[in-house]
Amino acid sequence: LQHLNNLIYEIEGNESLDDEKLESMQSLVASLTRIFTWLLSKKQLQLRGSDTKQQQIVSGWLQAKYSEYFDSIFKIWEYSNNKDFVAQFQIYGLSSVMNIVKAESKYMAPGEDQPFFATNTYDRVVRALIISGDKQNIRGSDYGIDNPLILEFYKQYFNAFWDVKYYFFRQLKMSLAQVLKDREDKFDMVLANLITLVKISEMYPRMDADSYTDTTLVQDVPQKVSDLSTFRSNFEKSWIILLQSKELSVDQYKAILFILHKRVIPFMNNPTKLMDFLTDSYNLGIEERDISLSIVALNGLWELIKRFNLDYPDFYTKLYCILTPELLHLNIRSRFLRMLDLFMTSTHLSATIVASFIK
């Protein structure tokens, strides 16, 4: 571990790393992963009441080294270095810690043959992942991030195994507020990483969710993992915590609004909780004279009215307020006109509003 840490410190600020040192680091991580997997299989990382004092001392020391192993990998995840060799080692570290999560889930269950997922260790992984990356790589157009680590996590784990996704939002819900409190400077990274994970595809196929949730990283997971209602609750709470934790910029509002109706709202238990966020988005668009922001906010409100029976009597009043000549110069003009046609042919439209528009 000391040798690995020395190499990690050497990376920081370096413009290059020769292949020999990179291979040395990867070999060290691979060796440590095998050692800790073996220790897990032999229950050497558990403190048991039947252990002698000497055994407890040894187990305590091993646990400290186990924790240090994760710290070493997570440290390099935070490096804001766009060099390929850094990304390569970050991704190698991801594979290693996820193998450990799998091993711990297998060997550290409270009882023999008892379904178990290593939530405490995975919580550390989630916390480290969501603050990873370089702020300079956040795209202004959609607030996604070019973060090789997050993209690899999405491809190999998040989108491939349901238990990984289920526990990601379970742990995020539980730890997000504390992460943002401890690392307030990382808010932009958290938002960009979450948008990147969520926007690529749906959380699960709504027409065939059962078969999707059967694919898991851990062989024997608790039965609750297949409960979509609990997943939606965790997903919903994670987003609400994030949206309420800090005042957002106009670009951040837009990025969230553009994915809201397809990637977020369908996977919440009670999407009407987004009403305040959508209203704030609309109002900010008016204040900043950015009608495009108000338009996409109205689109989100419309989804809640149409699909979840949200009672929002001010909708058409707010729509009427943005019907100005400026609309003709917007990049999303054609999209808005399609939305307007939908709004104006809806059964939600009252006779009074129809008369006002005709007038």
Regions found by a protein language model. Give the residues of each.
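Active-site-adjacent beta->alpha loops and helix N-cap segments on the catalytic face
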Residues: 329
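Alpha-helical solenoid scaffolds in large eukaryotic transport, assembly, and signaling factors
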Residues: 1-319, 323-324, 341-346
